[in-house]
Each structure stands twice: as C-alpha cells, then as structure tokens.
C-alpha cells in the first residue's frame, strides 16, 4: 500500500507515500486521509474498539490521552500532508511498529464517505463492506455460517492473484466439518480430539502450531475469585498434560506461562521463552498444594464452599475441556461447585467484556512476532483484560518495555 517510508533521525516521525494505483473496490483512490480517519476511529473511546490498545502499543503521540478521552481524536499523532502522504508522530521510538502495521485490522484504511453512507449498518453485509486488498466480500451476513470472497479487480496487484475466490465455512461440530471435507465441500479442515487419531496416518494429514493459547480468566471482581489463594488453588488443581493428551489430542502442549516458545527471539537469536525462564510455580499442577491453598482461601473468606460458573464457547474442543475442568475442580477442591455455561463465541466475548461472568475459558493468538502481543493484554483498562487485573508496577514495566527503557 505504501511505496516508500521515511524515518526521522530521532525515530519519532514516520512519513509514508501511498501508491498512486491503490484503489478501493468501488474505484475510489486510497488516500492518506483514509488512514487518518481509520486510526482516529479506532482511538475514539466512543467506538469501543476491541483493539484500541494497539494505538497505544504503537506509541503514537497522544494515544493514551485520546483513548481515555482526555484529548480529542484530532490530536492523535497522525495526519495527511496531502492525499498521498501520511505522517505519523510517535511519543517514543517503537521497535515493533512495522509488525503492528502488518498485523492488525485497526491500522488498515477506511473510506470515510462510504462508512458514513452506511450509517449503523457498516460492515454488516457484503454491500456495506469495501475492500482495498486482493479479495472483496461477495457474500456475508452476520448470522450466516459462510463467508465468500471474490477477486478484487481494482487491487493494484490483481494480475498476481491466482485464485478466483475463497470460501470460508463456519462449522462448530468437528464431525460435520470432517464429513464436509470428505464430501469435497471443503479443501482444508481443522481436526481435534478423536478425529486426529482417525486421520493421523492419512497422507493428507499435517500438523502445525497456530500459536494460540487457551487460558482461564477469572473475574477478579467476583466474590471468591477476588481471593488470591482461591485463584491459585484453581490454577494448581487441574492437569494440563491430561487436557492435551486425553482431551484435545490435537498436538497441543501444556504451558505454565503465557508467551509461547517460538514466538520471538532477541538479537542474539535466543528465544524469549529461554531468556525469560519460569519465574512462578502458581500454575504448576499440584493437587495437595491446591487443597491447602483452597482451605486457606475459604478460611479468609469465612466460607466452607463456593460455586462458580465456567463460561465457554460452543465448539467441541472448548466444551470437552470445560467438562474436564469441571470434573477436576469438583473432585480436587472440597466444597466447590462448577456450573457450565456454553455460548456462541460472540455472545461469550460480549459477556466477558462486560464483566458478566465468573470464570472464562478463552484463547488468544499472537498478532505480531513480539512478546508484547501477549504481555500488554494485562495492563489496566485493556479491552482484552477480561479479568480486570490491575497492578501499577506491571503497567509501569510494560510501558518502560515499549519505550525501550528496560
């Protein structure tokens, strides 16, 4: 999209030249103003974007003040010098700026005229979506189980696009997905559980790491879960090894940390996981230690029992893991009752973002190849910090790391 980039000596001013042949799928030119409008829209607290925190992660000038409503969006450090020149001002040099630009939809441009013409219906159907990439949406409804893309002839690299289109089917049942694959309705399908064992010797079968972390997020505003010993007891009383080998059986590996192996390396080629090591044992499976922590926590709360609801989405894998956790917790922690609440992913996320849940089973995948993609989720006020964890020292450490002060 940009044909050139210039960086000032202090690394605080970045100037991008937009390609002259960059066009929207309706034929309108892509301009620098499209980026200014889009970034301001993400930063605007009224938009309530899930990825608003990316604006601050990128160290864009005045990002924190704009996203918190202390300053107007017009003061965000992004402007159009002319139709094809985008100027970005940073509050401090950002080592991962290029990663961020290439990773998140929040930094893509938006055609302001088109967005405003759609009103509240923007991005709810194929007719209210506009593309500037190799494909455009030809069929999509919010409740549909299929999204169809076709080649975008207005794309500046259209001659290099070899596919006429791509079709995505949203299938929550693994058996149904596998049957569709066998019938020739799908070219690629993700397998889990017993289906992995069924297909692992098939020449069409292959494995790869998707970098996603499945994790539990307790709502720290809920009674009982606001107690650190109760949370530690929950963390230590289920067997992650058993989840990967007996429940999922899909090549997943257990982790006692959040930044996975293979995500990023330093200038010496050392993997972050090796450099960071493991500083805590709170997540290590140890039933006897968990029982002691549980007993201590109940005593501090003045209770002899607790009841929580575990929320998960309606996929086979998520439900199987949730059922395993329910069994482990109730068997290992006397006086604990766990109810399961199964919801479609969209509904689950809405409840978790509003803080209307007890314990959530959710997942997170890396947006860019740097540990910060996992670490700044937990800063105070982050839209992905469902647990409402808040620690001033942690916030300060993350902020220093972003600026390169550590």
Feature locations, PLM:
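Alpha-helical secondary-structure segments
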Residues: 31-38, 83-89, 93, 134, ...
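N-terminal lobe/hinge region of extracytoplasmic solute-binding protein
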Residues: 1-9, 130
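Structural transition elements
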Residues: 254-296, 315-319
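Surface-exposed binding/hinge segments that line
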Residues: 17, 34-36, 47-113
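Ligand/substrate-recognition segments at binding pockets and active sites
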Residues: 142-144, 287, 291-366
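Extracytoplasmic/peripheral linker and loop segments enriched in polar/acidic and small residues
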Residues: 244-245, 281-284, 335-348, 373-406
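Ligand-site clamp/hinge motif
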Residues: 153-198
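Gly/Pro-rich hinge or "lid" segments in bacterial periplasmic/extracellular proteins
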Residues: 90-161, 165
């Amino acid at each position: 999209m940009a044909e050139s980039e210039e960086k000032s000596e202090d690394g605080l001013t970045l100037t991008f030249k937009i390609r002259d042949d960059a066009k929207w799928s309706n034929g309108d030119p892509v301009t620098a103003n499209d980026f200014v409008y889009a970034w301001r829209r993400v930063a605007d607290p009224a938009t309530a974007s899930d990825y608003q925190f990316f604006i601050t992660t990128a160290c864009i000038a005045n990002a924190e003040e704009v996203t918190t409503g202390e300053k107007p969006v017009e003061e965000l450090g992004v402007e159009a010098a002319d139709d094809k020149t985008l100027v970005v001002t940073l509050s401090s040099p950002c080592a991962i700026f290029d990663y961020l630009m290439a990773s998140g939809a929040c930094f893509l441009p938006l055609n302001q005229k088109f967005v405003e013409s759609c009103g509240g219906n923007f991005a709810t159907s194929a007719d209210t979506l506009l593309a500037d990439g190799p494909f455009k949406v030809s069929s999509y409804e919010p409740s549909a189980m299929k999204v169809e893309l076709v080649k975008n002839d207005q794309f500046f690299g259209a001659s290099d696009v070899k596919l006429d289109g791509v079709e995505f089917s949203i299938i929550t049942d693994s058996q149904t997905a596998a049957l569709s694959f066998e019938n020739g309705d799908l070219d690629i399908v993700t397998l889990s559980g017993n289906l992995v064992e069924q297909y692992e010797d098939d020449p069409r079968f292959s494995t790869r790491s998707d970098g996603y972390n499945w994790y539990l997020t307790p709502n720290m505003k809920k009674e009982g879960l606001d107690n650190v010993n109760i949370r530690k007891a929950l963390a230590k009383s289920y067997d992650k090894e058993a989840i990967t080998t007996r429940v999922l059986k899909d090549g997943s590996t257990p982790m006692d940390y959040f930044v996975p192996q293979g995500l990023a390396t330093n200038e010496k080629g050392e993997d972050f996981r090796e450099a960071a090591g493991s500083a805590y044992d709170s997540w290590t499976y140890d039933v006897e230690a968990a029982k002691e922590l549980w007993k201590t926590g109940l005593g501090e709360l003045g209770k002899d029992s607790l009841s929580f609801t575990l929320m998960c989405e309606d996929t086979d894998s998520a439900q199987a893991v949730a059922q395993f956790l329910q069994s482990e917790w109730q068997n290992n922690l006397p006086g604990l009752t766990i109810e399961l609440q199964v919801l479609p992913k969209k509904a689950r996320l809405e409840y978790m973002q509003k803080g209307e849940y007890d314990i959530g089973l959710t997942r997170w995948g890396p947006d860019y190849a740097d540990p910060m993609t996992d670490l700044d989720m937990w800063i105070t006020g982050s839209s992905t910090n469902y647990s409402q964890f808040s620690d001033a020292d942690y916030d300060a450490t993350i902020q220093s790391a972003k600026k390169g002060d550590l």
